[in-house]
Amino acid sequence: MLSLNYGFTISIILFFIGIISLLIHKNLIFILVSLEVLINSIILGFILIGKYWKQIDCCVLYIFIVTIATVEVSVMLAIFLRIYQRYHTLDIYKLREISK
């Protein structure tokens, strides 16, 4: 079992990987995956805090956040599909040029 320090280290590393990936990528799908990595790193932190304080509330919060994230991903993928069908690209810079 992981100790609290290792768990928070993994959570912080995942958070920064998500931030860096969010800043580097210009494809909407990769940006969505980066946001999911960020959300999951925050969820991991909540679970570790709940385990440390021996509270079940964080597990309930985990289920709620995962449900919201799943709905978010499905809606965003549907929007991305429509964008791709219309403009034939998911590159944010090309979409910005098209919209001008």
Curated annotation (Swiss-Prot):
One of its GO terms (molecular function) is NADH:ubiquinone reductase (non-electrogenic) activity. It comes from the Bacteria. It is found in: Cell membrane. GO terms for biological process: ATP synthesis coupled electron transport. InterPro entries: NADH_UbQ_OxRdtase_chain4L/K, NUOK/Mnh_C1-like. Its main location: membrane. It catalyses: a quinone + NADH + 5 H(+)(in) = a quinol + NAD(+) + 4 H(+)(out). Keywords: Cell membrane, Membrane, NAD, Quinone, Translocase, Transmembrane, Transmembrane helix, Transport, Ubiquinone. The chain crosses the membrane at residues 4-24, 29-49, 60-80. Its EC number is 7.1.1.-. One of its GO terms (cellular component) is NADH dehydrogenase complex. Pfam families: Oxidored_q2. It is a multi-pass membrane protein. Belongs to the complex I subunit 4L family. NDH-1 is composed of 13 different subunits. Subunits NuoA, H, J, K, L, M, N constitute the membrane sector of the complex. NDH-1 shuttles electrons from NADH, via FMN and iron-sulfur (Fe-S) centers, to quinones in the respiratory chain. The immediate electron acceptor for the enzyme in this species is believed to be ubiquinone. Couples the redox reaction to proton translocation (for every two electrons transferred, four hydrogen ions are translocated across the cytoplasmic membrane), and thus conserves the redox energy in a proton gradient. This is NADH-quinone oxidoreductase subunit K. It comes from Buchnera aphidicola subsp. Cinara cedri (strain Cc). The gene is nuoK.
